[in-house]
From Swiss-Prot:
Signal peptide from the UniProt entry: 1-18
Keyword Lipoprotein belongs to the record: no
Keyword vocabulary terms for this entry: Digestion, Disulfide bond, Hydrolase, Protease, Secreted, Serine protease, Signal, Zymogen
Organism in which the protein naturally occurs: Anopheles gambiae
Protein name: Trypsin-1
Length: 274
């Protein structure tokens, strides 16, 4: 009898351990992810949910960052030679495998395709917390500006964004968490969220850091998603955030989390000259 009890206890412990491991895995999977990651380890990403189609001339700074010629993430034109995206979009990828397509409303056709010559990932990027989620891309060829290709404005170092500021996020990511990437560029208007409120919302996932900015509606419904990662969050013509991570997509009570651009303005200038 004692042997049977011991066996049952061992089985129970194994079942509990397995359940805890699965729960922990689910928590890891809420982090944002590219639509096609060169190093897929967890879900880390964002897509446009509850938004509307736009022409690229409405967001001429928008680029599609492509891994082996397939849409992977978004990005923003900073100058004729530099693009800003998320570090989790470039981690583990060689520059030779990356290109950007820009000047088109479709990520798979039109516009111009330019090779990436160099990736400058932020030295403090933390893949577990998605902190310092920034990468600069130096392009092989200089861009020619037009109505459909323009650099985005940048904030000053440590410039703040007031709570409730209306912002616009754009990209080709999913319109549903399990859907395919959008063929046509989309955007959504979302207000910024108080930092303490956002930190509380994500407390079970470790909270948010000072490098992070949150935007979205309490009731959900509008957000970025897988495939939008690395893309722009713009307010008054300035790039205030980079699509980074979140719990699901457009989930009530969980705003989208973006990498705050103002805190690395000097780093951008030092490494790109922009």
């Amino acid at each position: 009898m004692s042997n049977k009890i011991a066996i049952l206890l061992a089985v129970l412990v194994a079942v509990v351990a397995c359940a805890e491991a699965q729960a922990n895995q689910r928590h890891r999977l809420v982090r944002p992810s590219p639509s096609f990651s060169p190093r897929p380890r967890y879900a880390v990403g964002q897509r446009i949910v509850g938004g509307f189609e736009i022409d690229v001339s409405d967001a001429p700074y928008q680029v599609s960052l492509q891994y082996n010629k397939r849409h992977n993430c978004g990005g923003s034109v900073l100058s004729s030679k530099w693009v800003l995206t998320a570090a989790h979009c470039t981690a583990g990828a060689s520059p030779s495998s990356l290109t950007v397509r820009l000047g088109t409303s479709r990520h798979a056709s039109g516009g111009t395709v330019v090779r990436v010559a160099r990736v400058v990932q932020h030295p403090k990027y933390d893949s577990s917390s998605i902190d310092f989620d920034y990468s600069l891309l130096e392009l092989e060829d200089e861009l020619t500006f037009s109505d459909s290709v323009q650099p985005v404005g940048l904030p000053k170092q440590d410039e703040t964004v007031k709570d409730g500021t209306m912002t616009t996020v754009s990209g080709w990511g999913n319109t549903q968490s399990a859907a395919e990437s959008n063929a046509v560029l989309r955007a959504a208007n979302v207000p910024t969220v108080n930092q303490k409120e956002c930190n509380k919302a994500y407390s079970e996932f470790g909270g948010v850091t000072d490098r992070m900015l949150c935007a979205g509606y309490q009731q959900g419904g509008k957000d970025a998603c897988q495939g939008d990662s690395g893309g722009p969050l713009v307010a008054d013509g300035k790039l205030v955030g980079v699509v980074s991570w979140g719990y699901g997509c457009a989930q009530a009570g969980y705003p989208g989390v973006y990498s705050r651009v103002a805190v690395v303005r000097d780093w951008v200038r030092e490494n790109s000259g922009v």
